[in-house]
């Protein structure tokens, strides 16, 4: 019988909404979910490790990856490139494991064009005031960049209608529980299983 493929789960939302925190907590709960490491040209933040948090690239290196079509998606956000290496994503799905992409809204919409069967989840902040507080709390951004991120966030929230699900990140554990419920339900969808069970009937 054909092995069930994994799901491509795309999680995105405004900067500061807590995508990274939710993804880390989700992986602790579900060992079948692999985390897709993105490539970026932004400078590493304190504690970030190349190849673990991101693949840190120069602009020249990143543009070479674009030219060779080695990225599932890519976008330029607040002056830096972000993108998803395609080979790792395909290999993970084919192995039967789910893979989660934590990416910006622009990138998520590009992935939707190429992988319409993916599961697209928009992570919402409880409020814009809370979102600003989280960004300020990082202590890594200037006031100018914070204001720019907030303006972009308002535009991104308008794009949530293009997603399959919206999850509010009021508390990390609650957000994780909601996403786990979504993933479980998606694995039970008829269209994902029909070929597998057609083969079962044919064998018998």
UniProtKB/Swiss-Prot annotation:
SMART domains: GuKc
Source superkingdom: Bacteria
Main location: cytoplasm
Gene3D superfamilies, per the entry: Guanylate Kinase phosphate binding domain, P-loop containing nucleotide triphosphate hydrolases
EC number: 2.7.4.8
CDD domains hit by this protein: GMPK (cd00071)
Pfam families noted in UniProt: Guanylate_kin
Localization (cell): Cytoplasm
Keywords, ordered alphabetically: ATP-binding, Cytoplasm, Kinase, Nucleotide-binding, Transferase
A GO cellular component entry from the record: cytosol
Domain Guanylate kinase-like: 6-184
One example GO MF annotation: ATP binding
Similarity comment text for this entry: Belongs to the guanylate kinase family.
Function per UniProt: Essential for recycling GMP and indirectly, cGMP.
NCBIfam families on file: guanyl_kin
Protein name: Guanylate kinase
Originating organism: Halalkalibacterium halodurans (strain ATCC BAA-125 / DSM 18197 / FERM 7344 / JCM 9153 / C-125)
Gene: gmk
């Amino acid at each position: 019988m054909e092995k069930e493929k994994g799901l491509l789960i795309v999680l995105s939302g405004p900067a500061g909404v807590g995508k990274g925190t939710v993804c880390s907590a989700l992986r602790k709960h579900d060992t079948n979910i692999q985390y897709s490491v993105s490539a970026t040209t932004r400078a590493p933040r304190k504690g970030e490790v190349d190849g673990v948090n991101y693949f840190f690239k120069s602009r020249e290196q990143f543009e070479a990856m674009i030219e060779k079509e080695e990225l599932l998606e890519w976008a330029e956000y607040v002056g830096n490139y972000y993108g998803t290496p395609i080979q790792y994503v395909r290999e993970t799905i084919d192995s039967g494991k789910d893979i989660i992409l934590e990416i910006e809204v622009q990138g998520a919409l590009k992935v939707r064009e190429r992988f319409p069967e993916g599961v697209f989840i928009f992570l919402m902040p409880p409020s814009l005031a809370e979102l600003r507080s989280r960004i300020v709390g990082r202590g890594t951004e200037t006031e100018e960049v914070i204001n720019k991120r907030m303006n972009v966030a308002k535009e991104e929230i308008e794009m949530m209608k293009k997603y399959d699900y919206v999850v509010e990140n009021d508390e990390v554990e609650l957000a994780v529980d909601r996403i786990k419920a979504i993933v479980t339900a998606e694995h039970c969808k008829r269209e994902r299983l029909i070929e597998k069970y057609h083969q079962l009937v044919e064998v018998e």
